[in-house]
Amino acid sequence: MSRHNKGQVIVPTGGGKTMCMIHDAIEQFKSGSLKTVVVVAPRILLANQLSEEFLEFIKDVDVLHVHSGETHHTSTTNSQKIEEWHWKSKRHQLIFTTYHSLHKIQKATAMLPDTVYFDEAHNAVQKNFVEAVEHHSMYVLRNYFFTATPKHSLTPFKIGMNDTDIFGQVICNVKAPKLVRQGYILPPKVKIKKFDILEDKEDVAERDSQHLLETLDDNNINKSLICARSTKQIVRLFTDSDFALGLENRGYSWMFITAKTGGVINGKKVDRETFFNTLNSWGQDPHRRFVVAHHSILSEGINVKGLEAVLFMRKMDFIGISQSIGRVI
């Protein structure tokens, strides 16, 4: 990154992409002139997580969050207020935002970042995001695109990460087998379980419950992530079947989170901060057995400590599968 002002960093999940950003930001902040660094994430949850990780290593900076989520840091999605914050600041600046809100920084025309890190950059090719991405790629001096799963396009009518004018060349490409050999990540093991065809009037939630409990029993899994088809499937699994009771009888705790329901722990609704604090606490507890169910919130970039397996209850594309597996390797 010290040799390139723009480029793609392709590293498998768990390979240290965030530390690459943090180390580069530390080097930038050694400059005599004040620097503004923007970190872009696909989700508010990941933006908040990245903020915590950066600030473990970087002190004495001003921090702004540009998204609609909750944070104890200064936060706004108003472009004029972004400009005012920028010009009032007397220190180096870290701005954490989402692809959804990146255009708010674009419209803050009285400021220009020095460096932008695009995390989970395969999201940057989406048509509702790419205009703001292209703007920063064109006008910001340093742009870096980090992902484990680059998304390319075979047609000139659709943007892909093979558009080097926007995304630059690949400046780093680390292969997963290398990280496995060196002990940084574990090789995933795939096991397939066949579902029986439903009989007439058979309860779908009960069938799902039976198969999930059998899978946990057969594989002796202590901490598992369940990828469900929908919020409805998750809610029915825990309310219309004996799944929760079966888990409790086996010594498991349980939790789920969706955009519609928010976080739920052992049947009790909690705020997101409590949910993720509990999730990470359980993940680090060697004696705790639990399952956590979701649709997509936990897929990309979210660090969940201690997970041993992911159970797929729906079809997913290559990127979705890769990102989900990345939570446990």
Model segments located where?
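Post-DEXD/H (motif II) to motif III coupling segment of the RecA-like Helicase ATP-binding lobe
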Residues: 122-185
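Conserved Walker A/P-loop ATP-binding site and its immediately adjacent core
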Residues: 18-20, 33-56, 229-234
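Conserved helicase motor "Helicase C" RecA-like lobe of SF1/SF2 P-loop NTPases
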Residues: 231-258
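Conserved RecA-like P-loop NTPase helicase motor core
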Residues: 259-329
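Conserved helix/coil segment N-terminal to the catalytic DExD/H
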Residues: 74-115, 127, 297
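Conserved helix-turn-beta segment of the N-terminal RecA-like "Helicase ATP-binding" lobe
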Residues: 45-76, 245-246
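Walker A/P-loop
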Residues: 4-24
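Conserved interdomain linker/interface between the two RecA-like ATPase lobes of SF2 helicase motors
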Residues: 168-235
